């Protein structure tokens, strides 16, 4: 069973998604171990501030190195995770091959950025690997972290009810899936049976 630790400014946002549906059931059944950690808990100031102005000026704020370093150091004392993944638009674009590689690990730490990004010094110190979910800009790293976690969770034994479910999906076998229909025939559009016949 893999353990995934997510370092974020919004742990409740992550928990809300990860407690539902297939991933939530997989967690409850003990097939995957996921923990969300609030970086603000390591701010070290009364206002729990974790951002600062960028060195050299410019617009926007940057996440400070120290709270991130302290948070991930604390996580490593519990999980001993060798790999830290930073969700970043500058990183390798996520593919199913990368998901399969990460899903084989015993534990992972996923770091969510925010504001204009993260102080590069802490990424270098942690030897963080950068992964992107696409060539576009989001307000934070939480959604990319959830995408990665969801994709990894699906490959863990017991998470999906059917052990063959992931192996026949288009991203897994490299082939596009055919259109999908339900068995209900009472719909104003042509029935699946009629559509199937029209394709023959």
Placement of each model-derived feature along the sequence:
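Structured adenosyl-cofactor binding patch, chiefly the S-adenosyl-L-methionine
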Residues: 118, 122-165, 169-171
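C-terminal functional extensions of proteins
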Residues: 164-189
């Amino acid at each position: 069973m893999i353990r995934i630790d997510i370092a974020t400014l919004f742990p409740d946002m992550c928990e809300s998604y990860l407690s539902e549906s297939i991933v939530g059931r997989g967690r409850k059944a003990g097939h995957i171990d996921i923990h969300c950690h609030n970086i603000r808990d390591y701010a070290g100031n009364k206002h729990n501030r974790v951002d600062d102005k960028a060195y050299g000026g410019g617009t926007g704020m940057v996440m400070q190195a120290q709270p991130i370093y302290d948070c991930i150091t604390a996580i490593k004392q519990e999980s001993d995770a060798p790999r830290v993944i930073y969700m970043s638009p500058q990183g390798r674009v996520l593919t199913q091959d990368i998901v399969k590689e990460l899903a084989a690990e015993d534990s992972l730490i996923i770091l969510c950025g925010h504001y204009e990004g993260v102080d590069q010094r802490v990424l270098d110190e942690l030897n963080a690997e950068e992964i992107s979910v696409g060539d576009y800009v989001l307000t934070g790293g939480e959604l990319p972290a959830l995408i990665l976690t969801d994709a990894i969770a699906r490959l863990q034994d017991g998470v999906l009810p059917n052990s063959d479910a992931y192996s026949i999906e288009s991203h897994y076998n490299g082939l596009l899936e055919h259109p999908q229909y339900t068995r209900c025939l009472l719909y104003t559009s042509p029935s699946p049976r009629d559509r199937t016949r029209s394709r023959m």
